[in-house]
C-alpha cells in the first residue's frame, strides 16, 4: 500500500502506525499497530480513539494484512475481531461492512486496499463538508463550548465538531472556545486543548462541572459535540457527559449541535435505548494515569460506575450537522434518519 499520513494514522513500509493519544500532549509518540492484537489493544486503551478514526484504522489494517499474504478466511476472522473492539462506535461497523464486501471479491487484495484508501479520502472530504455546513450556524463573536475531542486526532480530516469550530474561527466568527476537560480520561483537557493551541484558536479549559455556571452567566452561545452513534429517532450516543451538557443547554435556551458524518448514522437502531454502552475500568475513575505517571486518589476498595458513553435524547438537540447538510428536529420527526436504511 502507498505511504499515507494523517494527524493520527501513518502507513509506511507496509506497516500501520498510530499516534499514541494517551501520551499527548506531553509526548508525540507513534506506535506499531500492524497486527489485530496490537490494534485492538490500542483501541481498548484509547491510544487510538474517535469513532471515525477507529473505523479507518481497522480498515487500513485489513488491507495491509491482505497485502502481506493473509488468506481470505484469516481476514474474515480478523474483521470480526476488529468489529468487536468498540461496540458503541458504529463507524467501525459501517467501515468494516464495506471492507467485507471488498473481501468477497475474487481479486480481494487490491480491492481491500482500494476500499481502505477510499474510506480515508471520503473521511477527509466529509470533514470539510461538515465544517462548511456547521460554520454557517456560528454567529459572529460566538463563545462556543465543546466536549471530548472531535478534531483531526479523531478523524482523517479536520474533524467534526472541532472542524466546524476551526472553520468558524478562520471566518472570524469565534471569540472563544470553552473546553470541557472531559473526565475521566481528559480528552478535552489533553487533546482538544492541544489541537486548538496548534490551530491558534483561543480557548479556556474548564472542569466539566463548570459548564452550568458559564451558561447561567450568559457566557456560552452554543454547544458543539460529536457523536459515536446516531439512532434512527435522532438520539445520540457520545462521550459520557454529553447528556448533561444537553440538559443544561436546553434549560438555558442555548443551541446544542451534534456534528458527525453519515457513517455515524445507524438507521437500524430504533433509539438510544438500543445502543450498547461500553463499561470501562474502575481505575480510570479512582485515579489518573498518563505519560506523566499514575496517581490514585480514591480508596483501594472504592466501587465504581464508569460508562464510556451516554445517550442524549433527540428532543434536546437543536440540529444534526452531517456531511450532507444540517438536519433539523422537524426533519428527524419526519423520519429522515430512518430512510437511510433504504
From Swiss-Prot:
Annotated site location: Transition state stabilizer: 148
A GO BP annotation: L-methionine salvage from methylthioadenosine
Coiled coil: none
Keyword RNA-binding: no
Reaction catalysed by this enzyme: 5-(methylsulfanyl)-alpha-D-ribose 1-phosphate = 5-(methylsulfanyl)-D-ribulose 1-phosphate
Active-site feature positions: 228 (proton donor)
Enzyme class per UniProt: isomerase
Organism lineage: Bacteria, Pseudomonadati, Pseudomonadota, Gammaproteobacteria, Enterobacterales
GO MF annotations in UniProt: S-methyl-5-thioribose-1-phosphate isomerase activity
Functional description taken from the UniProt entry: Catalyzes the interconversion of methylthioribose-1-phosphate (MTR-1-P) into methylthioribulose-1-phosphate (MTRu-1-P).
Residues annotated to bind substrate: 49-51, 86, 187, 238-239
This protein's record includes keyword S-adenosyl-L-methionine: no
Name listed for the protein in its UniProt record: Methylthioribose-1-phosphate isomerase
Keywords in alphabetical order: Amino-acid biosynthesis, Isomerase, Methionine biosynthesis
A Pfam family recorded for this sequence: IF-2B
Amino acid at each position: 500500500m502507498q505511504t499515507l499520513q494523517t494527524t493520527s494514522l501513518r502507513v509506511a513500509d507496509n506497516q500501520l502506525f498510530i499516534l499514541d493519544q494517551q501520551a499527548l500532549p506531553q509526548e508525540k509518540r507513534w506506535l506499531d499497530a500492524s497486527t489485530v492484537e496490537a490494534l485492538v489493544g490500542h483501541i481498548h486503551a484509547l491510544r487510538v480513539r474517535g469513532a471515525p478514526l477507529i473505523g479507518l484504522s481497522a480498515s487500513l489494517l485489513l488491507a495491509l494484512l491482505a497485502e502481506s499474504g493473509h488468506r481470505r478466511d484469516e481476514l474474515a476472522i480478523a474483521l470480526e475481531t476488529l468489529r468487536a473492539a468498540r461496540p458503541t462506535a458504529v463507524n467501525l461497523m459501517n467501515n468494516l461492512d464495506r471492507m467485507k464486501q471488498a473481501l468477497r471479491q475474487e481479486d480481494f487484495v487490491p480491492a481491500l486496499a482500494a476500499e481502505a484508501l477510499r474510506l480515508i479520502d471520503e473521511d477527509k472530504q466529509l470533514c470539510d463538508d461538515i465544517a462548511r455546513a456547521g460554520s454557517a450556524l456560528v454567529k459572529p463573536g460566538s463563545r462556543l463550548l465543546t466536549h471530548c475531542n472531535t478534531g483531526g486526532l479523531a478523524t482523517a480530516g479536520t474533524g467534526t465538531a472541532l472542524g466546524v469550530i476551526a472553520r468558524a474561527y478562520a471566518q472570524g466568527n469565534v471569540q472563544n472556545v470553552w473546553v470541557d476537560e472531559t473526565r475521566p480520561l481528559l480528552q478535552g483537557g489533553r487533546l482538544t486543548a492541544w489541537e486548538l493551541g496548534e490551530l491558534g484558536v483561543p480557548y479556556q479549559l474548564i472542569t466539566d462541572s463548570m459548564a452550568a455556571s458559564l451558561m447561567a452567566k450568559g457566557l456560552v452561545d452554543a454547544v458543539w459535540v460529536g457523536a459515536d452513534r446516531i439512532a434512527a429517532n435522532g438520539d445520540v450516543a457520545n462521550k459520557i457527559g454529553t447528556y448533561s451538557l444537553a440538559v443544561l443547554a436546553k434549560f438555558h435556551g442555548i443551541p446544542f449541535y451534534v456534528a458527525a458524518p453519515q457513517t455515524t448514522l445507524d438507521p437500524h437502531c430504533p433509539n438510544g435505548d438500543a445502543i450498547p454502552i461500553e463499561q470501562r475500568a474502575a481505575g480510570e475513575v479512582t485515579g489518573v494515569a498518563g505519560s506523566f505517571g499514575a496517581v490514585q486518589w480514591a480508596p483501594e476498595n472504592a466501587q465504581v460506575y464508569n460508562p464510556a458513553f451516554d445517550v442524549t435524547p433527540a428532543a434536546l438537540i437543536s440540529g444534526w450537522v452531517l456531511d450532507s447538510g444540517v438536519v433539523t428536529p422537524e426533519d428527524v420527526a419526519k423520519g429522515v434518519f430512518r430512510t437511510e436504511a433504504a
